[in-house]
Amino acid sequence: MDKKTRVLSAFNCQEVDRIPAGFWFHFPEDSCLGQEGIQHHLDFYHAIDADFIKIMCDGYFDYPNPYIPNIKKASDWRNLKPLGKDHPFIRGQVERCKAINDALQGECCTFYNVYNPMSSMRFGSSDEMLMAHLKEDPEAVMYALDVIAEDNAALAELVITEGGCDGIYYCVQNAE
């Protein structure tokens, strides 16, 4: 049974020859972007012979909305606007996925790591500010989360339709 069939069969509750396995970690910050980051993913995959790859979003943690550094009070979140599908933050991640998938030529399933909007917001600000603003004006923060979710949804769609990924790994950590 090939790797892709194994993973997709397991997802569909069908019989597999063995349990699919994959491992991942964050690559070094100083070498996670561009061709070097792409090569890290490919080298790691080939070294461990995993059944699938979780393509990491290393280098793309901070949601780069230019308005976020100007946020001082909770109501300021209402001024956030989506980055849009053509923003370099989104395009760079799609290009990473496409390069990795082109190199693998369908050998295995690939899933791109997408953080939830709360994590994206936290990466661009701070836990303390975010929690204070949630208490002060939850509707303003919810509005901003919806804006970030719009960008995250565009990213998820594009890494599949243009980047060639089989799906996303949706990370729901933070703000517990």
Where are the language model's segments positioned?
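Active-site loop segments of alpha/beta catalytic cores
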Residues: M1-E36, H40, D51-I55, K85-E176
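N-terminal glycine-rich cofactor-binding segment that shapes the pocket for flavin-like pterin cofactors
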Residues: D58-Q93
